[in-house]
Amino acid sequence: MLALKISVYSVVFFFIGIFVFGFLASDPSRTPSRKDLED
């Protein structure tokens, strides 16, 4: 049961990480660091 719980949490955090990374990468206009890079 412990191995099943660990595997489920691993998959959940993996998809959450992909979602957050994709959201930040697809919407760079809202991040202030984009303007710093353009300067």
Swiss-Prot record:
Record-level GO BP terms: photosynthesis
Cellular component terms (Gene Ontology): organellar chromatophore thylakoid membrane; photosystem II reaction center; plastid
Disulfide bonds, paired cysteine numbers: none
One Pfam family from the record: PsbI
Membrane topology per record: Single-pass membrane protein
Cell compartment(s), UniProt: Plastid, Organellar chromatophore thylakoid membrane
Annotated protein name in UniProt: Photosystem II reaction center protein I
Oligomeric form and interacting partners: PSII is composed of 1 copy each of membrane proteins PsbA, PsbB, PsbC, PsbD, PsbE, PsbF, PsbH, PsbI, PsbJ, PsbK, PsbL, PsbM, PsbT, PsbX, PsbY, PsbZ, Psb30/Ycf12, at least 3 peripheral proteins of the oxygen-evolving complex and a large number of cofactors. It forms dimeric complexes.
Entry keyword annotation includes Plastid: yes
Coiled-coil region: none
Keywords annotated in UniProt: Membrane, Organellar chromatophore, Photosynthesis, Photosystem II, Plastid, Reaction center, Thylakoid, Transmembrane, Transmembrane helix
Origin superkingdom: Eukaryota
PANTHER family with a match to the protein in the record: PHOTOSYSTEM II REACTION CENTER PROTEIN I
HAMAP family (alphabetical): PSII_PsbI
Residue stretches spanning the membrane: 6-26
Family per similarity comment: Belongs to the PsbI family.
Main location (coarse class): plastid
InterPro entries: PSII_PsbI (IPR003686), PSII_PsbI_sf (IPR037271)
